Amino acid sequence: MNHPDIARRVYNHTWKLDPIIRSLLDTDFYKLLMVQMIWGLYPTVNVTFSLINRTKTIRLADDIDESELRAQLDHALSLRFTKKEMIWLAGNTFYGRKQIFEPDFLQWLENFQLPEYELARKDGQYILHFHGSWAHSSMWEIPALAIISELRSRAALKKLDRFALDVLYARAKAKMWRKVERLKKLPDIKISDFGTRRRHSFLWQRWCVEALKEGIGDSFTGTSNVLLAMDTDLEALGTNAHELPMVIAALSNNDDELRRAPYQVLQDWNRYYGGNLLIVLPDTFGTEAFLCDAPDWVADWTGFRPDSAPPIEGGERIIQWWKEKGQDPREKLLIFSDALDVDTIEKTYHHFHGKVRMSFGWGTDLTNDFTGCAPQEIATLDALSLVCKVTHANGRPAVKLSDNPEKTIGDSKEVQRYLNFFGNKKRVARPVKM
């Protein structure tokens, strides 16, 4: 792969539109896995995805020009999967399995285009919604977040001259490489790139991926970014997301259906995928509630991805549950991916080494850590906590409780109903990093 001079490219930025999203594969792999299942099992469900800025102090609409945002969103609307991309999806092996994508789904994907968006401004924030069929609207989440994150980076970089840009990227590369050198000291560690949605830029994410390939070799297991996986001959990695139980729960018609919703999702998933893709995401309505009611067969799955509790605390709770179910944790897998930095990775690795198989999905701290790199302080270079979540399904409000109340999403009355139903046990408020 060619290694462009990122600073020069930023400085020579004179064209009318430099597309941030150049391919529909510039997304997380689990989106394609989920969308195939959604397309097959829930073709008539309509949803709304909404942008949510959890960093309330940042007035996003003041940082990003609306016309530039619309231009980037409009460009994404024009994209289609290319013949080369379709051949790769059809012929590549994912998670050791050929033809993971069914021919009928690939035929549907050939004609896929993103649905229209709704954009407005209010009190310094952007109000951005995506409506439509679940299979279509879901595909907006990652490109929308990547567009906004990179536009904010570009706005910050406009304040720097060519020399300052050289300094910025030289420092950022050195900072990144120091992290790589620390990770090299952890034997048998498994690290993957989960940094697409809040990246500084596509080019920077690509450089970080190349740095990990060079620096830690086989310990770098792959990337969630499908386009980068294709272009760099890496494994495309990903499991499933909170949107699945959020939507199924929103569609429930009674308490019994609501209680079964998180496990119905797993049964659906098992119809399509197996092996290392059998990873449980337990915290949508609180991990404690999930484990309390989980059927015994859930313990037979490959592993868990504890997402919103502190990694050591969350991992220990799952290990305890496995033992209660007669499972050997040393044969199970924990995937840690929530707001990881190198300090957290090191601490978690040392705590669990020899107790359980581990993998780390490294996100924003990998692809958007420019703090202290600019010759002068530029606050808009700092990453912010931005999400794009499903908020309605067939007109009904969708809810995410999480193990951290600060990450709760949904209409306040509906959130309270879910809390009354699932309980509030072991949910502890903590500052949200990313």
From Swiss-Prot:
<comment type="function">
    <text>Catalyzes the synthesis of beta-nicotinate D-ribonucleotide from nicotinate and 5-phospho-D-ribose 1-phosphate at the expense of ATP.</text>
</comment>
<dbReference type="InterPro" id="IPR007229">
    <property type="entry name" value="Nic_PRibTrfase-Fam"/>
</dbReference>
<dbReference type="GO" id="GO:0005829">
    <property type="term" value="C:cytosol"/>
</dbReference>
<keyword id="KW-0597">Phosphoprotein</keyword>
<dbReference type="Pfam" id="PF17767">
    <property type="entry name" value="NAPRTase_N"/>
</dbReference>
<protein>
    <recommendedName>
        <fullName>Nicotinate phosphoribosyltransferase</fullName>
        <ecNumber>6.3.4.21</ecNumber>
    </recommendedName>
</protein>
<dbReference type="InterPro" id="IPR006406">
    <property type="entry name" value="Nic_PRibTrfase"/>
</dbReference>
<dbReference type="Pfam" id="PF04095">
    <property type="entry name" value="NAPRTase"/>
</dbReference>
<keyword id="KW-0436">Ligase</keyword>
<dbReference type="InterPro" id="IPR036068">
    <property type="entry name" value="Nicotinate_pribotase-like_C"/>
</dbReference>
<feature type="modified residue" description="Phosphohistidine; by autocatalysis">
    <location>
        <position position="242"/>
    </location>
</feature>
<dbReference type="GO" id="GO:0034355">
    <property type="term" value="P:NAD biosynthetic process via the salvage pathway"/>
</dbReference>
<dbReference type="InterPro" id="IPR040727">
    <property type="entry name" value="NAPRTase_N"/>
</dbReference>
<keyword id="KW-0662">Pyridine nucleotide biosynthesis</keyword>
<comment type="similarity">
    <text>Belongs to the NAPRTase family.</text>
</comment>
<comment type="pathway">
    <text>Cofactor biosynthesis; NAD(+) biosynthesis; nicotinate D-ribonucleotide from nicotinate: step 1/1.</text>
</comment>
<dbReference type="GO" id="GO:0004516">
    <property type="term" value="F:nicotinate phosphoribosyltransferase activity"/>
</dbReference>
<dbReference type="InterPro" id="IPR041525">
    <property type="entry name" value="N/Namide_PRibTrfase"/>
</dbReference>
